[in-house]
Design a protein with these regions (language model features):
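Hydrophobic faces of well-ordered beta-strands that scaffold small-molecule active sites
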Residues: 3-7, 49-51, 71-76, 108-110, ...
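Structural motif
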Residues: 43-44, 102-103, 196, 232
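Generic structural signal for well-ordered alpha-helices
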Residues: 34-38, 57-62, 93-98, 129-136, ...
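Conserved radical SAM core fold
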Residues: 10-12, 77-82, 114-117, 204-210
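Gly/Pro-rich active-site loop or hairpin
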Residues: 17-31, 86, 163, 179-235, ...
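N-terminal pre-domain/capping segments
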Residues: 1-101, 140, 144, 257-265
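Active-site acidic/histidine proton-transfer and metal-coordination neighborhood
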Residues: 66, 81-173, 182, 250
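Acidic-and-aromatic substrate-binding clefts and catalytic sites of carbohydrate-active enzymes
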Residues: 48-60, 79-89, 116-120, 152-157, ...
């Protein structure tokens, strides 16, 4: 298994400001100096990095190679359930896939499925499933492996909602252990249940108060998850993510790498 890091540890995430008036330009973006962040991830000892689509828009040719990093994945997302804007959203995801291909990414990860003011309907899940199939096709056209990332504050947070969407789409599964645990899921059980759909994973820890913390400081059973991955002969990327953390991101990145290496033995 290879170990990467999500660049949002240094700056979090915002939507690109142009997207306020142009859905097709509503890229995710970690503010700040992406090249500096790449240097910090490399200095911590990681092999790869995951970047938001908006950071790839700004990335200079050769930046990854200069730091000795592989692009494990590019992360994008959309509402997916509003038919009138879906073509604009898919245009943006196609752009993310093009950028991912250009910079040598292996995976296209998408989150989303908008929460309405009313509970999600079966039609919402049908629309989400069909849109994710289109995302999968876009990714594959560009040589990327497509996965869906459940996330708090979307219509797919926990186990019951996972069943709803995965019954309606062929896209792969990128589990985010912190988000799944925060939504009431058992990450170990979910790894075993969906083992044949998982080509990529986010290692993220969370407290009972839903604060994201360095690995091993929260509620996630990482030893159990890693055992489930081994049982499934998983040999892909483990991407560590730690956003919204008040501590030193550089020290946390080093500690997280040591923690994962300890799990892998």
């Amino acid at each position: 298994m290879r170990i990467g890091y999500q660049a949002n540890a240094w700056g979090g995430v915002v939507g690109h400001p142009v997207g306020v008036t142009s859905i097709k330009d509503l890229f995710y973006l970690t503010p700040g100096d992406t090249d500096d962040t790449l240097g910090r991830i490399a200095a911590a000892g990681y092999e790869g990095v995951e970047l938001f689509d908006g950071n790839l828009v700004e990335l200079a040719d050769g930046a990854l190679e200069a730091h000795g990093l592989a692009l494990a994945g590019v992360y994008s997302g959309a509402n997916f359930v509003f038919p009138d804007v879906l073509p604009e959203e898919l245009w943006r995801i196609r752009r993310a896939a093009e950028l991912g291909q250009r910079f040598g990414a292996e995976h296209l990860v998408v989150g989303g499925g908008a929460q309405r003011t009313e509970p999600a309907t079966l039609e919402d899940y049908e629309r989400l499933g069909k849109a994710l199939d289109e995302v999968a096709s876009i990714a594959e056209e560009h040589g990327l492996t497509p996965t869906y990332h459940p996330h708090l504050s979307t219509i797919v947070e926990g186990p019951d909602q996972l069943e709803q969407v995965f019954a309606r789409t062929r896209i792969g599964f990128c589990p985010d252990l912190g988000h799944l645990a925060a939504a009431g899921g058992d990450p170990v059980e979910l790894m075993r249940r969906y083992a044949d759909r998982i080509p990529y994973i986010h290692y993220k820890d969370v407290t009972e108060e839903v604060a994201f913390v360095p690995l091993g400081q929260g509620t996630v059973d990482f030893a159990g998850v890693t055992g489930a991955l081994r049982d499934a002969a998983y040999d892909g990327w483990i991407v560590v993510e730690l956003d919204g953390y008040d501590g030193d991101p550089d020290a946390a990145a080093r500690d997280n790498l040591s923690y994962v290496r300890g799990l892998l033995g």
